[in-house]
């Protein structure tokens, strides 16, 4: 996601130790940034606006005391990215003492069904136990079965009805079932659609009108291309989404579409999702400031610290470190440490959180988590 990291380094080199930023300097800065933005699938309209905002803030700017020219320009770029992305995170609308209904809508292949499971698991980790997934994606072969398997994997009930393929009927039945059985949250996996399919969009709008969900999320593939933003803007006029969930945001995905979606549709990005697994680190609450930092290759220490706190047992880690300094550290202790590292997710993702590192280690073989598996196999093959 750090698609501007190389540009940042070139900006630092070009500005040097100048006391004032002139028009020529701004032009040089944008010559570095614009190609990177376009290559990362940022819409041309957004690139133009980004240029305007940067120029407004940097032209004839006096360098503040305590900052270098490079630091101040990069800070302006980071703040501009943050403002485009939304400035403040928007929390999930979870209410007590009522049934929360979340409706997931997405184009075909967006990863909507996988997101349904991830959102359910995310809410479950918030200590909300009674969650119901409603399988209503009847048009995609295997869609119902996929959600059933996901529900089984994360131990969350899935409502289905094999006697009908009417999505609207099944959704209403599922909600009634949830109310009768005191569920706290319902997550509805709807049928995927094509932007040109007005019938499907109208059907989804009718379903939404009937069930009045608390949240209606549009699930968007981060690899969908620049044109997707305009299509979502049009569809939003009928479906009134409350937010966007971006999928396929893996370490090697540029992520530029996030800027386009946010600026063109004016919809808040609520979550970002990566991988098919239902782990905590594969489904993240969206913090605009943190994402802006990642885009610039400046890391994201706040998220890294949260992951460590959530996944690493501090007592176990302290015991292993004590053994290491007491010269009492053996291969079995190493294996325990490797397991702790695996809980954190992929090496690539961990290192991308560290400022100045993510953009320099993309092609290293050490980033392959299979190396941990190999180490473990070697340790387990050893004799006592």
Annotate each PLM feature:
Residues 1-19, 291, 348-352:
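Polybasic, Ser/Thr-rich amphipathic helices
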Residues 171-175, 179, 183, 193-209, ...:
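Conserved phosphate-handling catalytic cores of large alpha/beta enzymes
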Residues 2-6, 24-27, 44-48, 141, ...:
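Alpha-helix N-cap/helix-start motif at coil-to-helix transitions, marked by capping-box chemistry
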């Amino acid at each position: 996601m750090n698609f501007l990291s190389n540009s940042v380094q070139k900006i630092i080199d070009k500005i040097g130790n100048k006391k004032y930023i002139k028009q020529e300097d701004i032009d040089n800065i944008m010559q570095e940034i614009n190609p990177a933005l376009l290559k990362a699938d940022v819409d041309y309209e957004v690139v133009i606006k980004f240029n305007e905002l940067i120029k407004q803030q940097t032209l004839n700017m006096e360098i503040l005391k305590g900052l270098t020219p490079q630091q101040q320009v990069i800070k302006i770029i980071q703040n501009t990215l943050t403002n485009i992305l939304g400035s403040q995170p928007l929390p999930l609308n979870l209410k007590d003492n009522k049934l929360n209904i979340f409706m997931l809508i997405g184009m075909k292949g967006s990863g909507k069904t996988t997101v349904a499971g991830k959102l359910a698991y995310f809410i479950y980790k918030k200590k909300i136990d009674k969650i119901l997934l409603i399988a209503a994606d009847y048009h995609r072969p295997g869609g119902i079965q996929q959600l059933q398997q996901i529900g089984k994997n994360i131990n969350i009930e899935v409502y289905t009805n094999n006697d009908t393929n009417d999505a609207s009927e099944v959704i209403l039945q599922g909600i009634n079932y949830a109310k009768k059985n005191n569920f706290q949250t319902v997550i509805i996996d709807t049928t995927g659609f094509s932007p040109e399919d007005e019938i499907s969009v109208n059907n989804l709008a009718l379903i939404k009108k009937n069930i009045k969900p608390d949240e209606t999320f549009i699930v968007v593939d981060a690899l969908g291309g620049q044109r997707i933003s305009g299509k979502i803007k049009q569809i939003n006029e009928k479906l009134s989404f409350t937010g966007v969930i971006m999928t396929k945001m893996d370490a090697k995905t540029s992520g530029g579409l996030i800027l386009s979606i946010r600026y063109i549709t004016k919809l808040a990005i609520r979550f970002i999702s990566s991988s098919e697994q239902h782990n905590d680190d594969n489904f993240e609450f969206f913090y605009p400031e943190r994402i802006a930092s990642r885009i610039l290759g400046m890391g994201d220490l706040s998220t890294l610290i949260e992951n460590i706190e959530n996944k690493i047992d501090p007592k176990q880690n302290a015991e292993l470190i004590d053994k290491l300094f007491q010269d009492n550290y053996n291969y079995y202790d190493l294996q325990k440490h490797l397991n702790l590292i695996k809980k954190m997710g992929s090496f690539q993702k961990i290192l991308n959180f560290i400022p100045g590192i993510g953009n320099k280690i993309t092609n290293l073989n050490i980033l392959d988590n299979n190396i941990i598996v190999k180490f473990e196999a070697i340790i387990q093959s050893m004799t006592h």
